[in-house]
Amino acid sequence: MNIIEQIEKEEIARLTANKTIPAFAPGDTVVVSVNVVEGNRKRVQAYEGVVIAKRNRGLNSSFIVRKISSGEGVERTFQLYSPLIAAIEVKRRGDVRRAKLYYLRQRSGKSARIKEKLVSKAAVAAKAAQ
């Protein structure tokens, strides 16, 4: 492992020490809690939407979340290990067959819906046994 990879791995460990990042994939509906600074006030703002793309590049990993706000599609790119992200919560898992869901940009209404991924009974039983 070269020096850059080692430094990036240490930085990721430092940034994730006080928060947990759940496993999520494109198609999942997530709520991203973002720290917003307005003047001297600091507050947490929730941004809920569908993950349409995820870019895994170590420390430079990012993901794009799309939501419909007052009839208009809004996309926001987040850096996965950004200190501005307070928390990420997965609301529901989506069952998709693509890594990048850019086709959702042209869709609206019912055609933009994503089928929910159902958990098998065997997986539920295994989780309950733990």
From Swiss-Prot:
Matches recorded under HAMAP family: Ribosomal_bL19
Q: Which gene encodes it?
A: rplS
Q: Name one GO biological process term.
A: translation
**Family the UniProt entry places it in:** Belongs to the bacterial ribosomal protein bL19 family.
Q: Which organism is it from?
A: Cupriavidus necator (strain ATCC 17699 / DSM 428 / KCTC 22496 / NCIMB 10442 / H16 / Stanier 337)
NCBIfam families recorded:
rplS_bact
Alphabetically ordered keywords of this record: Ribonucleoprotein, Ribosomal protein
Q: Which GO terms describe its molecular function?
A: structural constituent of ribosome
Pfam families this protein is in?
Ribosomal_L19 (PF01245)
Per the record, GO CC terms? cytosolic large ribosomal subunit
The task this protein performs is described as: This protein is located at the 30S-50S ribosomal subunit interface and may play a role in the structure and function of the aminoacyl-tRNA binding site.
Cysteine-cysteine disulfides? none
Q: Which domain of life is it from?
A: Bacteria
The protein's name in its UniProt record: Large ribosomal subunit protein bL19
Q: What InterPro entries has UniProt attached to this entry?
A: Ribosomal_bL19 (IPR001857), Ribosomal_bL19_CS (IPR018257), Ribosomal_bL19_sf (IPR038657), Translation_prot_SH3-like_sf (IPR008991)
